[in-house]
């Protein structure tokens, strides 16, 4: 079918060797040695190959499930501290994917899903832990902000939009999406506004918890490929959320007070009361380790919602030493990232130990945890990153404590080994 035929004008009309369409019926005709293929056939071949890859990839994944020890080791490469939380996450994630790979019940025993609740202050590593797990397992990952969610029918995002975002991450491959991880941040912000059910609708608090119940537990969610409430005529995708791992995280500010009230430590009055001294006071992190489901109910989460998150992990507040480690030790440490940026300019970047301590202290003062470290380093390096591309012969930039405190400019060491201090403009 690839032979040339006259087109009546004295020229030759070319035809696709596969489908027989002429060059005028297709957008593009690609020529080979005595053979032609049109763009439509190329696209069809790509679709066939993609479908075969989809069928093969789940089988290949069977042999790639890391053990809890291996998962923990990967987390250690990117996340400093939080040993207890890492252990809890490694076991929960391993069991979840083991359940998916052995979907057929044995002896009638059907394995339930164990979603995860992470409790810890801002910047303690909740999001990073979830992201790292998804990257290690090579599964689709998406994040949702609980504060933007509302009940269906109200202004805001429907909970089904979470699944739609997950589908977007894997090019609307339903099978792949059903092996994904969803991280819902700020989950504490959808707590019930009062202990007693209100006669008015709480569309962004308890209402969202109710809407999330079925999604987290497992349901067949009908999701439009284009998302949202538009395009009502289009065909919906059916996604089984019982196979998706949901990780919810929040700072739960004030939860420690609820726990202390339950513990009744040093709360009595009178001559026989136990008085709580300074030495008996626990840190917020230590108090959160004692959290019970009843404390979360008191905080404002409904019992049914807590029941869908059986695995609980608490993250401790990061101290100065941990922040210093985060700055320099992980594979993608902030100082290593900026050193790589400077290396592109053929310049070495050095942070002295006293500079790292000063940066950690500044982050502690701001109470932003590890999340605030990048913005601090960005601010310190702003002027030098602005000037460096226009400066010749700089071989090394040194950052010390005085630079972090704003008392001096970075030390520039030139290629001729003569050290100078960059003069402030």
UniProtKB/Swiss-Prot annotation:
Check the record and name the SMART domains matching this protein: AAA, ClpB_D2-small, zf-C4_ClpX
What's an example GO cellular component term for this entry? Answer: HslUV protease complex
UniProt-recorded Gene Ontology molecular function terms: ATP binding; ATP hydrolysis activity; ATP-dependent protein folding chaperone; protein dimerization activity; unfolded protein binding; zinc ion binding
Which residues are listed for ATP binding in this entry?
121-128
Classification via InterPro entries: AAA+_ATPase, ATP-dep_Clp_protease_ClpX, ATPase_AAA_core, Clp_ATPase_C, Clp_protease_ATP-bd_su_ClpX, ClpX_bact, P-loop_NTPase, Znf_CppX_C4
The domain of life is Bacteria
Every copy of the ClpX-type ZB domain together lies at 4-57
Record's keyword terms, sorted: ATP-binding, Chaperone, Metal-binding, Nucleotide-binding, Zinc
Q: Which Pfam families does this chain map to?
A: AAA_2, ClpB_D2-small, zf-C4_ClpX
What this protein is reported to do is described as: ATP-dependent specificity component of the Clp protease. It directs the protease to specific substrates. Can perform chaperone functions in the absence of ClpP.
Q: Which family does it belong to?
A: Belongs to the ClpX chaperone family.
Q: What is this protein called?
A: ATP-dependent Clp protease ATP-binding subunit ClpX
Gene of this entry: clpX
